[in-house]
């Protein structure tokens, strides 16, 4: 269990954390900090293989929602936001901490990357943030905050 600090600055706030893979994930550090200040969290995991690593962390966070989210699978992003709407009716913040690039796009010179590799990288690493913002907007009736991470390789 994550200890909650006495000054619960985020008490009553509800947030979605996307990108926890294990205890070394930047998203995990963000989630611990948000929880420590009293936020209630929804956490996603990539697939069944990742679930075995993320589920114990979600328990430690006392996450109210734990759902699969492969952003390249049609309907999964929508399902996450539908569940948040059903359970909470609102959303105060989203942490988008995911990125992906095909192996061949990570090797060699950037000018040699294939169109397909580049588009896959942009879809997962960038466009999904925009899509999540679109899906979050109706739940952020009083405003909200969107966080995304970058990497020095970008």
Question: Which residues does each predicted region cover?
Answer:
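Conserved glycine-rich Rossmann-like NAD(P)H-binding loop of the short-chain dehydrogenase/reductase
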Residues: 39-53
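Conserved mid-core segment of classical short-chain dehydrogenase/reductases
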Residues: 58-59, 67-78, 82-119
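Canonical Rossmann dinucleotide-binding motif of NAD(H)/NADP(H)-dependent dehydrogenases/reductases
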Residues: 7-43
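Conserved Rossmann-like nucleotide-binding pocket used by diverse enzymes
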Residues: 16, 42, 67, 94, ...
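Catalytic loop of short-chain dehydrogenase/reductase
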Residues: 19-28, 32, 99-138, 142-154
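Residue-level detector of anion-binding/catalytic polar loops
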Residues: 40, 64, 90
């Amino acid at each position: 269990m994550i200890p909650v600090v006495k000054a619960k600055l985020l008490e009553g706030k509800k947030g979605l954390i996307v990108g926890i893979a294990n205890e070394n994930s930047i998203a995990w550090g963000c989630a611990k900090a948000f929880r420590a200040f009293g936020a209630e969290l929804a956490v996603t995991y990539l697939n069944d293989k990742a679930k075995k690593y993320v589920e114990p962390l979600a328990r430690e966070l006392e996450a109210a929602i734990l759902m699969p989210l492969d952003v390249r699978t049609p309907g999964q992003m929508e399902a996450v936001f539908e569940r948040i709407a059903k359970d909470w009716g609102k959303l105060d913040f989203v942490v988008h901490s995911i990125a992906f690039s095909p192996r061949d796009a990570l090797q060699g010179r950037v000018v040699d990357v294939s169109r397909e590799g580049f588009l896959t990288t942009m879809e997962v690493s960038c466009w999904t943030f925009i899509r999540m913002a679109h899906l979050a907007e109706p739940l952020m009736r009083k405003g909200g905050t969107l966080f995304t991470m970058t990497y020095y390789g970008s």
